[in-house]
């Protein structure tokens, strides 16, 4: 299979939201994933340049196979994960959240999360971001191992998203 990696457009927010919900609805351990991203959230994120959604599209079927949502929280955002790991105030603008990664079950096993991560990191590095942070449920070995293989390391365990346990993983670029 071949996949094309592109940035999503704001008008694709509904498709992305549907994919996220489909994945979440099919999960046995739904507490591993906190899908806060509604259609309006994703649309505004893209339109207001507060983030980007990278999508992998299967070139044969033209179906969206996976997505990786990146958020630029900014230093004034109280949810900036840099605050959780005690980054200095002047470094908080250098933080990007590797926020939501999903791959449709039909397209798993092709390394799409790794490919989407690498594509996003390349752009973030060029844009001057230094700290790439994400959260993973401690029992979600698949996501944790994927991120660790990409060079992320666990820096803290916290309660997030209404009291759910999460590991904060970081990669400096």
Set out the residue ranges of the language-model regions.
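Conserved beta-strand-loop-alpha-helix junction that forms the acyl-donor binding cleft
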Residues: 108, 134-144, 161-162
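Conserved acyl-donor/pantetheine-binding loop and adjacent beta-alpha core of acyl/acetyltransferases
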Residues: 63, 69-100, 161
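Conserved active-site alpha-helix within GNAT-family acetyltransferase domains
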Residues: 114, 126, 138-156
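Conserved GNAT acetyl-CoA-binding A-motif
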Residues: 124-136
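Conserved acetyl-CoA-binding loop-helix of GNAT-fold acetyltransferases
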Residues: 100-103, 109-122, 145, 149
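A short helix-loop-beta-strand connector motif used in the catalytic cores of GNAT acetyltransferases and
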Residues: 43-55, 71-77, 97
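Conserved N-terminal entry element of GNAT/NAT acetyltransferase domains
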Residues: 1-14, 18, 22-25
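Conserved GNAT-fold acetyl-CoA-binding loop/helix
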Residues: 21-44
């Amino acid at each position: 299979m071949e996949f094309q990696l592109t940035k999503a457009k704001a008008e694709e927010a509904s498709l992305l939201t549907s994919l996220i919900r489909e994945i979440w609805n099919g999960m046995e351990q739904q507490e591993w994933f906190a899908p806060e991203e509604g259609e309006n959230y994703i649309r505004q994120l893209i339109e207001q340049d507060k983030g980007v959604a990278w999508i992998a599209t299967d070139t044969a079927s033209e179906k969206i196979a996976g997505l990786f949502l990146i958020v630029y929280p900014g230093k004034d955002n109280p949810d900036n994960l840099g605050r959780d790991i005690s980054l200095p105030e002047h470094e908080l603008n250098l933080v990007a959240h590797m926020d939501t990664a999903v791959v449709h079950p039909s397209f798993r096993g092709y390394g799409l999360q790794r490919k989407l991560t690498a594509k996003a990191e390349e752009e973030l590095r060029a844009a001057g971001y230094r700290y790439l942070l994400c959260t993973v449920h401690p029992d979600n070995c698949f996501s944790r191992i994927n991120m660790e293989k990409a060079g992320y390391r666990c820096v803290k365990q916290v309660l997030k998203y209404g009291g759910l346990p999460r590991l904060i993983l970081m990669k400096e670029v």
